Amino acid sequence: MTRGRLAPTPTGYLHVGHARTFALAAARASAGTLLYRTEDLDAGRCRPEFADAAIEDLRWLGLKWTEGPDVGGPHAPYVQSQRLPWFQNVWSQLQAAGAIYPCDKSRKDVERSLTAPHAEDDAEPIFPPALRAPLGAGRE
C-alpha cells in the first residue's frame, strides 16, 4: 500500500506550491491512501486560522485525503504537536534500550560536511558519513 503525506506549517496562508505538491502526491497515491497532518511545531508563528485555511483551500481545489484532522482515521492525531506523547514514548523506549547517544558536532560542522565533495550513494542517509561516530561513542 502506498501512503502519501502533506504536512504544511500554518505560519501563513497556504502557498500554491503546497497545493501543487499535494495534487501530485494525490495522483501518485491513487492506489493507496493520502494522509494530511498539520505541522504546527513552530508555536510562535503557527495560527489555527492558517491551519483551517489550508484545509479549506485544498478542499476548494477538490483534493481529498483519507486521513486528517478534519476526517479522522486510524493514525490520529493529525496535528503534529498532539503527537508529542507518542514521540516521548518512543524516546523512552530507545533510551531504555541504550540506543540514544550524543553527537558532539555543531550545526556548522554538519553544514560544512554537507558542502564537502563526497561519493554519491542513494542508499546512504543524508547525515554525512564522516561525522557519524560509532554507536554509543561518547556515552559514559
What are these regions (language model features)?
Residues 1-119:
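N-terminal Rossmann-like or analogous alpha/beta NTP/dinucleotide-binding catalytic cores
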Residues 107-140:
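Active-site cores that bind ATP or allylic diphosphates and position pyrophosphate for catalysis
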